[in-house]
Amino acid sequence: MSGGSADYNSREHGGPEGMDPDGVIESNWNEIVDNFDDMNLKESLLRGIYAYGFEKPSAIQQRAIIPCIKGYDVIAQAQSGTGKTATFAISILQQLEIEFKETQALVLAPTRELAQQIQKVILALGDYMGATCHACIGGTNVRNEMQKLQAEAPHIVVGTPGRVFDMLNRRYLSPKWIKMFVLDEADGMLSRGFKDQIYEIFQKLNTSIQVVLLSATMPTDVLEVTKKFMRDPIRILVKKEELTLEGIKQFYINVEREEWKLDTLCDLYETLTITQAVIFLNTRRKVDWLTEKMHARDFTVSALHGDMDQKERDVIMREFRSGSSRVLITTDLLARGIDVQQVSLVINYDLPTNRENYIHRIGRGGRFGRKGVAINFVTEEDKRILRDIETFYNTTVEEMPMNVADLI
C-alpha cells in the first residue's frame, strides 16, 4: 500500500477497525491535491469539469479522486453538499475507455431522484469525452430499458438496487467489463432495506472489481459491507467542520402547539418574498395534508413524495428546477435527491426524526459558499431534538430575527 499512513491497522480503541466510538472513520490517506490541473486528468475531462463551473476541488475531491483513479478500494465518509457525486463521477470518467462500447462502471443510489441527479452530473462532466450514462430506475418502462441496454451498452450505469439487480439478472446489463462499482449514500440504501439486493449484485460482479463506497454515517451494516466486499480500503473522512452548515444561517421559531405551525408558515410566506424554498415534513400523509391546506389558502405550492409515480415526480422536479414552481413540500426521501441551485430557504416544518437527516435537508441550501437560510419550527417537545442537533453538529441555531427576509 502506498500513500497510506504507517499505522494502517493500528487500533487504539474499541469498536471496529478504523473506527472511533462515534461511528466516524479514521482517515488513512494523507495526500491532498488542491487543483484539478494537478490530477493528471484527461484533457477532455478537465474541460468538462471547468465547463460545469468547478474551479477548485472541494475537501473530499482533493483527497479521494487520486486514490479512486489509482484503482484503490475507497471508503469516503461525507455528507451531501460536499461534492461527493463529482468525486466518483470524475474518477469513473478518468478510467473509462471511451472507444470500448461496454459498460465499465456501475453506480448504486438509494432513490430514483439521486440516481438521475448522478446521471446528470456524469453526463455534464463527461460531455467533451462523449461518455454515455444510463439511469436504471424503477417506475420506468422495463421493455424500453432492455432495448436501450441491448442496442448499445452505456459506458456507465447508475441506478437503484432493485432495478439494477433486475437488469443484471435478466442479462440485459452485462457485468463482464464492469471494473468500478460505486455505492453512493450506502447508509441510505441499507436503511431502506436494499441489503439483500446489494449483496446479490456483488455476487454477479467480477471479484477483482474496484469498490468505492460513500456514506454520511457508518452504522454497522455499512461496515459489514466494507469488510465483506472491500480489499484494504483507503479511508477518507471529510470532517464535520468542512461540511456545508458553514454559510447557512440556522434559525428556529417557537411554535407552542403543532396546530399553530400552519399559521406560522403562512405568516412567513407573506414576510418573505422567497426566491425558492423547500419545506420538509416527516410523513407522506402530512405532505398531502399541508399541500391541501396551503392550496385552500391560495398559496401556490408543489408536493413531492415517494407515493407519486415517476412521471409526476419528474414533472414537479422540472418545474421546481426551472423556477416556475417556487415552493416544494416534501419528505426526507427526497432530501437526498434534490440539488437545486436556487434554493436559498429550507423550512423544517417538522424537525427530522434522526439528526443525520438534518444536514441532508439543509446542506442543500448553501452549496459551496452560496448563502442559505434554514428555519426550524420548534414545539415544546422538539426543543430537546434541536439541542441534540446543535450538539451533534457543533453549531448554534438562534431564534429567528424580524429581518430574516434580508438574509435570504
Swiss-Prot record:
UniProt xrefs under SMART domains: DEXDc, HELICc
Catalytic reaction annotation: ATP + H2O = ADP + phosphate + H(+)
Residues that coordinate or bind ATP: 77-84
Keywords attached to this entry: ATP-binding, Helicase, Hydrolase, Initiation factor, Nucleotide-binding, Phosphoprotein, Protein biosynthesis, RNA-binding
Locus of motif Q motif: 34-62
Keyword ATP-binding among record annotations: yes
CDD domains registered for this protein in UniProt: DEADc_EIF4AII_EIF4AI_DDX2, SF2_C_DEAD
Region (Disordered): 1-22
Pfam families in alphabetical order: DEAD (PF00270), Helicase_C (PF00271)
Top-level class of the enzyme under EC nomenclature: hydrolase
Gene Ontology terms for molecular function: ATP binding; ATP hydrolysis activity; RNA binding; RNA helicase activity; translation initiation factor activity
InterPro entries, A to Z: DEAD/DEAH_box_helicase_dom (IPR011545), EIF4A_DEADc (IPR044728), Helicase_ATP-bd (IPR014001), Helicase_C-like (IPR001650), P-loop_NTPase (IPR027417), RNA_helicase_DEAD_Q_motif (IPR014014)
Positions of the Helicase ATP-binding domain: 65-236
In-chain residues carrying the UniProt-annotated modification Phosphothreonine: 160
Cysteine disulfide links: none
Helicase C-terminal domain mapped to chain residues: 247-408
Catalytic activity, EC: 3.6.4.13
Motif extent (DEAD box): 183-186
Protein family (similarity comment): Belongs to the DEAD box helicase family. eIF4A subfamily.
Subunit-structure text: eIF4F is a multi-subunit complex, the composition of which varies with external and internal environmental conditions. It is composed of at least EIF4A, EIF4E and EIF4G1/EIFFG3. Interacts with EIF4E. May interact with NOM1.
PANTHER family: ATP-DEPENDENT RNA HELICASE DBP3
Free-text function comment from the UniProt entry: ATP-dependent RNA helicase which is a subunit of the eIF4F complex involved in cap recognition and is required for mRNA binding to ribosome. In the current model of translation initiation, eIF4A unwinds RNA secondary structures in the 5'-UTR of mRNAs which is necessary to allow efficient binding of the small ribosomal subunit, and subsequent scanning for the initiator codon.
Protein name: Eukaryotic initiation factor 4A-II
Lineage: Eukaryota, Metazoa, Chordata, Craniata, Vertebrata
Gene that encodes the chain: EIF4A2
